[in-house]
Structures are given as C-alpha cells and as structure tokens.
Amino acid sequence: MRSFIKTHKRASSLDNSPRKSSNESPENRRNSQGSFGTELSYPSGYPPNNVLKQSSSFEPLHKLTSNKIFSSKLFKKSSNGKTSSSNTSPLLSRSDAETFAPLLSNTNNIPAIKGTRKHEWGDNDDTSESVILLNRTSMSSMSDTNQDTPDTEIVRIHPNSQQGSILSSQTSADRTPRLSLEEAEDVEDYDITKHSSLSRSQSLKKKRNRLARIHSHDDIMHLRSQSSFSSDLLGSGFSPIPEKSPNPSPLPKYERSPRKENNILDRTNLFDLRKISEASYTAEDESNFNRPFTGVAGGETIQITTSIKDSFVPSPETSHKIRFAADNVIPLSKAQIIENSASEADEDDSNEEDGEEESDSSSRFSFENGNDLCGRTASLKYYSTETNTPPLYVNDIYENDNFDDEMNYFDSNEEEDENMDHLYGGDNTALSGFAGMCTLSDDEFDRTNAAISQELSSHSSQSSKGYTERQRGFSKRDSNKSFEDGNDDYDPSNHCRSYHDIYNLSDEEEAQTINKKVTEPRKRKISDGTNKVTKYADMFLLSDDDAESGSQDEDFGDESRENDVKFNVNSERYGVEHTNLVTTQNHNLNPISFKSPSRFLDVSNVNHSPLAYKTPERNILKSPLQQPIKYHGVSSLLDNDIQGTMKNLYYIDETDEDRFLENSAESEEYYLDEINGIPEDFEFSDDENIMRNLSPLSRLNRTKLLAFRRTHSYSDRPLGVLKDNTPLNYKLEIKNKTVTFFDHNSIHRSYSEPFSSSLLHDSRKSEDNCEDRILDNKTLASPVTPNSSFTKPSPSFTQNSSLSPIQESTTSSDASPKIL
C-alpha cells in the first residue's frame, strides 16, 4: 500500500508540476539536470501552447481509482497548492541527450509516454533524470517501418560544435522546418557546455558506439533503398572523433551521386557497409567542402575539407546527404583504389580487410540474390572440392597375404587345397568338361604344354603321324602302365590337349565306357549310398537331409567319372599314373544317368550308346526312338552348356503316378460317403444311373476331374458337406413383384449341365435315336415358368439341379432386383 501511495504522489506531482519561468538561465537548467548540455531549448518568445502536451490517454490515478473499494481519504493530499501553477509538460526540463520535437503545429496527435531512464552511456551526473519518448526509435524513425507515426518531421539538434547542424530524416519540397536556422543557433549558443572538449568527445564517441550496436543490418540496408546514395562512398570507413583532438569538429559530409536504384553493391562495399556506426540524412547546401577536417586512422593524418555555413535555409532543391562515423578514415585516393578493386590497401589500414578476404579465399563464386538491398539478402557461395580421390591401400580392404608380387589377388583357401595334393599321390587337375577348359589360365596351359613337350622330346621317334610335339604320345613307361588292352586302337591324339581338340571329338569317343577304377581323389568324394527314391510315393518320405545328400550324390554320376578319366591324361605333374581304359564288355558300373538325353536322340548314336535315357526305377530301357519323351525331358542348348540343371531332376514314370492317384481317389470317395451320412447298403435308383451315363462327364472323366481338383487345389482339398433336401429360398423383390427360386436336390448330387432334364425327356421318348436327340438343339427351349398355378414336377425334374422361379405378381421389370 505504501508503494502504491508513493506511485500516486509521483504521478500527481508530474501532472501538476509548475511551469518553469522562461527567463531562467541555461546555466541553472543545466546544473539542475546534471547533464552536460541541454539538447533542445526554446527562446523566450516561443509560444508555450506549441509545446508537447500530456497524452489524453494518461489519466491521473485519482480519476482511475474512483471506485468504492478505495477510500477517498487516501487521495485528499494530492490536491495541493501546486494545481494553481500552469500544467506545463516536463518534457522541456527533463529532456534526453537527443530529444525529438515536432515541426508542425498539430502536436496533439503525438502521444507522449513518460518514463525514467536508469542508465545512460557517457559521463553523466547521478542526478540526471531524463524522460524517454517511446514514439520513435533512434534510427528506425528514418525508415518506413514505423507506419503509425504521424507525418511530421523530427528535428534533432546536436551541440557538438559552435555552428551546430540540423539533422533531418526527410526534406521535401512541400515541408518547411518549424525552427529557423537563426533560432537554432540561438538555442545552441545558450547550450554551450563549459566542460572540457576531451570529456565531450569521449561521451560523443560512446554514444555513437552505442548507436552502432543498436542498429541492425536491416536498418543499414533500408538507408540504401531510401536514399540511393553512391556506393563508392562506402569503400572505406571513417574513424570517430579522436580522444586527444583539441577542437572537435563535425563529421565530414558527402553528397550523393546519381545512381540507379537497382544497383547492387559489390562484396567489398558490403563489407565496409557493416562498419558504419551512425548514418543520418543531413540537409546541407551543395557547396560545403571548404573547412579542413583532421582525422587519424592507423597513425595517418588525413585532411578532408568540410564546412557549415552560418546561414542556412533549406530549399526544395536541397539534396539528401549522408554522414558516416566509422572505424577508420582513409584518403580519398585510397577510396578510388577500393572502388576500382584493382590494388591492395595500405598495410596499416587493411589489416581487418585482409582477415575478411582470407576467410573467403576458398570461395570460387559468391553473389547476392535479389534486385535491391531491401532487408536481409541470401548469399550463396560455392567452394572448390577436391578432385583427387584418396589412394586406396591394400590394408584397407584385403590382407597383404592375399596378394602376390604382381599384386594379383588370390584366395588362401584355394592355395591350401592345392598344397594338399601330395597326400593323394600328385597334383591331379583333371578337367570336368567344357567349363573346366574355360577355367584354365594361360600360365597353367603353358606349363602343361611345356611339361608334355619335355616328355615327348626323348620319345619323339615313336610318333608316326604329322602332329606337333604337344599332341604326341607319352613315354613308354606311362604307356605300358596306362594301357593293358587295345594299345593298337588307342590314339593319344584323339584326347583333348588344346582348345581346338574339343571340336575333333566324335560321338563314338564320347560314348565309350570307362573303367571302374578311377583316381583316388574322385573316388573318395563319391557317395556310396543308394538312391532311396524308387517310386512316386517315396518322394513324400524323403527328409531334408536325404534330399541334400541325394543332390550332392548326383554331381558324381557317370558323366563326371567319364570326364575325369578322359581328361586325366592332361595331368600337370610327371609322376601321375593314368588309369586304364577297358572295353564295353568289362564295364560293370551302374548305367543310371540323370543327364538330359539330347545326344541320344540322334539316329547314328543309338547303337553306340549303352547309357540310354533311364529313370531310377529301371536299369535298361529301350531305344529313345521307341520311348516317348516327356516335355521336361526335351533338351535345349542351355541344358547342354550349363551342367547340373536337368540332371538333378527326378524323372518318375507317369503310370506309377496315376496308380497312386487312383488309390488315393477311391479312399477319399469312401470318406466322403461316410461324412455325408450315406448308409453302406444304400441303392441308387435307375434314373440316377441313366442320368449319370447320359451325363457329358463319364465316370472316368469325373474321376480324373476329382483327382485333378485334389492335387491342384490352391488352398486345400475339397471337403464333403452333409446335404439336406430342404430348399434354400432365394427371393428377388422388384417393387410389387417377388420371385422365389427353389433348389431341388437329391440325396446323391450328381453333376449335370443346364437343361439336362429336357435331354433326359427326349431320350425316354425315343431310346433308339438318343444320340440324335442330344445333338438336336431345337428342343433346347427356354425354361417354362407357370403363370398362376404350379404343378408337381415329374421325378425326372426333381433330379435336376435347375431352379424353378415362382411369380407371385406382375409388374414392370424396369426396376433392379433386390436379393434378401
């Protein structure tokens, strides 16, 4: 409550404060406020009615608190003798360092919000109590962001020099400043401070630095869009007033040069634009470069001629000026150099610029988006990327042990398998068909031919044919061990020793039988287990292990054995013992083969091939010409080239499959009769037998159909359902018409096509011409629908599966049926 009373007293004192006399000296006003100088003061002849008045919205508290809740005695002391004094706004006595005043006479529209600023930059006394005007901000008043501000001009008077300067946010042809230049100079003469120039320069520097921190990038960009000044002026910054300057002078003023509005500043000017600490429009005459100005920038003294005329009256032709206060002041010659962007700046003045350029040195492209500098702009930069890919080392992916001296990759597992060949009696690299020939490398092929040529060099006298040394016979020792029978018939040139010998093989040589004894490594890999699948039913008894073992055993059939011995002659090492080739009479191997019988279809090869196309059930079959070949037994070129596709399939005789299906069908029919509740001694009528015989589907065909449905069911085998003679009522309602369909079924439901009852009726009339009646389509009339009465159908009609509609009433048939 005490704080509330104090607030009320303070508001009342502000509301009823006496007007100070106009003849009060500036010294007394300055000492009472405790500031270094009053920014705005009016002469004695200035009318007091034009002073800013209190806002109408700011009501005193005794008017706002006239409720019954508050006691009237609380505010009796507020009405004291001070009310007799004139109600002068305290804005005149409590002004800020930079106070804005209206230029037009209509000042009642501008609300004055009163408050106290607790902290202020600069050397001020503790007794300073300035009043803040919250109508405008310091820099945003010069922009168009404040839309609700009345269209009035704001004048700001700076006491930084004896001449002074009037800053205007805008100056147009139809607007005239409220105060003349003479009156402003009189006010400034009264407000000249007696403080030292050093303290004043320091305070101004701090205030401008404060403004530089407040101004955002948007405000600076908005100045560019409003004034359209020359971007060449932004090529360099300007230092603030130095601390040791004996005579502080106003900042230099530059004229704007005509330039297009849509020109975009380059990157150098945009960088310098960020250094601006204070910028404002200044209305000056065009001829004001007369008085020298001294500035220090990095130890360098620069003189720029500026002047302010004593008498100044703004005119409509006055152009806008901009004033800069930046970090550095550089010569005009250097500004031209920066504008041309052709040379580097001085070492003392370009330290900060060099740091900025170094940060963007890696940028290849940089440009600004947008036609004008309005607000924030997006900068897109493209940086150079490395085109050289990093080297790939062996240690990153593979191990060093998997590469030879020529950096050829090899598998260590394969090398271990090759090193184990000495346990089996030598390196046996027998080829396994055409695919094995393609897997040979050039080095292996050359080593094999070199070994054969060394053997043939000592036994070249035995060759009687015109073949090369690579295609001649082996040594005497190898030939005596290799061949026991038929040495005269054996020709080593007929075996494959090169790629071209593959095409010299005949069908008779390919069909020759082989000896039971093969090389040791191949014999160990052959499985001794017999094939368990002998009929169609055995396929369902196989487990997963049996299926895998069966597929592995098939890879080592007669064909692989034949190829192993046939190409075993091309062994790489010297001490390899070759197997013996025997005749067909000594052959005692199982002639079962699962390979596709493509070559056995040739007529010339029938008498020479004991390995005919066989199934696992039969050992010896007839010639392929007399045996029907199934669709999956027909070979193709793909089957001949790729091994292991057709030979792994099971070929089951269809008779065994049909026998299995017939046995299963009979058992299922028995189960269906039992499920349907049909007694065992049930006798079907003769009519049903006749109808069954006349049905287009005979018993044999019907059995095959049932077998097909059982084996080719997509979801599950069909299950029997108990039949009932109760008809299922199906009704169709069409407005006033109702049609009901009844389904007449017998105990044993048989399959029949539509209108079979008419066929049966015709067959009873003339049994001799039964077949002709069936083929006669004239008797196939539309089903008869009774109009009013329904007679009991004949027994033959009851056996039919057709539907008999019942028409209860007649009406239009344009409506759609409705199924209940």
Curated annotation (Swiss-Prot):
The lineage of its organism: Eukaryota, Fungi, Dikarya, Ascomycota, Saccharomycotina. Keywords: Cytoplasm, Zinc. It comes from Kluyveromyces lactis (strain ATCC 8585 / CBS 2359 / DSM 70799 / NBRC 1267 / NRRL Y-1140 / WM37) (Yeast). Residues 17-30, 253-264, 467-484 have a biased composition (Basic and acidic residues). Residues 454-464 have a biased composition (Low complexity). This is Zinc-regulated protein 8. Involved in maintenance of polarized growth and daughter-cell-specific transcription. Residues 1-54, 158-182, 231-266, 341-370, 454-498, 777-820 are annotated as: Disordered. It is found in: Cytoplasm; Bud; Bud neck; Bud tip. Residues 1-11 have a biased composition (Basic residues). Residues 344-360 have a biased composition (Acidic residues). GO terms for cellular component: cellular bud neck; cellular bud tip; cytoplasm.
